[in-house]
Amino acid sequence: MYKIVLVLTLFGAVNGLDKICLGHHAVPNGIIVKTLTNEKEEVTNATETVESKTLDRLCMKGRKYKDLGNCHPIGIIIGAPACDLHLTGRWETLIERENSIAYCYP
């Protein structure tokens, strides 16, 4: 009898794990750097996460997002011409690609 209850409990637990969300969560790593706006800014690094339940901060289902492609977020802020296309529309989450180019103007 206990085995049957245990098996049914396991099936019930596995049933709730049918949705997996992948994402990144930024965590502070303790390194302090000097930036353009702050003398002492703690650097964060992104940690890849896999979640078995929907977390609003990580999952993209039902959210409006903007894929920046090769444009870096700094390029949008400083007004790089290649990033002008990303100034239109509304979005909740930005997707930054690993191969994005950060533009520097003198």
Curated annotation (Swiss-Prot):
Main location: virion
Description of post-translational modifications: In natural infection, inactive HA is matured into HA1 and HA2 outside the cell by one or more trypsin-like, arginine-specific endoprotease secreted by the bronchial epithelial cells. One identified protease that may be involved in this process is secreted in lungs by club cells.
SUPFAM superfamilies: Viral protein domain (SSF49818)
Localization per Swiss-Prot or TrEMBL: Virion membrane; Host apical cell membrane
GO CC, one annotated term: virion membrane
Glycosylation sites (chain numbering): N45
Similarity comment: family membership: Belongs to the influenza viruses hemagglutinin family.
Function: Binds to sialic acid-containing receptors on the cell surface, bringing about the attachment of the virus particle to the cell. This attachment induces virion internalization of about two third of the virus particles through clathrin-dependent endocytosis and about one third through a clathrin- and caveolin-independent pathway. Plays a major role in the determination of host range restriction and virulence. Class I viral fusion protein.
Name listed for the protein in its UniProt record: Hemagglutinin
Organism, as annotated: Influenza A virus (strain A/Duck/Manitoba/1/1953 H10N7)
Lineage: Viruses, Riboviria, Orthornavirae, Negarnaviricota, Polyploviricotina
UniProt gene name: HA
